């Protein structure tokens, strides 16, 4: 995890806020570093995590997590981490010859053209409370949910899935949901933009990573906007003024600073 980002969010590993839906967005940059932060943060905080990875392999996340001081393989073995490797599941679905395995595949809806109930059932079962567990709270992390749009899932079905996930994990289980949606500004993808806007109205916190309008800079890799509390306060998102920080990504951590106050500039 990135301690400076925890400080900006007022988060710590001793106590974890519950019932929160956090939306991660990016535009003209890659916001994946935010996913790695939350994955390592919740594991180090002692939460049980269900991670739905739709864009990268387990080894990719494991290598990054190792740099952040978290061993994903150990977390899986101990039952703290339930990892769905979407790339492998989708490959098995397309090229596998085992009908029984296809039925139990959480992504079987992609072939059947049905709703996302199999994936929801997987998430719900993975995070359901059970006797003897000592984890602080259940957490669902999805990276990147907009990939399902490109695989043919209608936006309304995807929004229904997210609604049920929030109702189950955040309300029923008193846990948290973190979801990444890549920006659609460059591609003009209307469905992706609809998904992002709809989820933004349902979230308590939005972290939005943006590329610099001035272009590439060696010492400043982008800026992060933090929107808070629009759902709980009843305000519209546009009425909520974001906190804005610039950042530089390094090998094992990310440095944040106020706009124009990079050490290279000063």
Swiss-Prot record:
Entry GO terms, CC: cytoplasm; elongator holoenzyme complex; nucleus
Annotated Pfam families: ELP6
Pathway membership, UniProt: tRNA modification; 5-methoxycarbonylmethyl-2-thiouridine-tRNA biosynthesis
Keyword Lyase found: no
Signal peptide (from-to): none
Keywords for this protein: Cytoplasm, Nucleus, tRNA processing
Quaternary structure, from the entry: Component of the elongator complex.
Entry's family note: Belongs to the ELP6 family.
PANTHER family: ELONGATOR COMPLEX PROTEIN 6
Protein name: Elongator complex protein 6
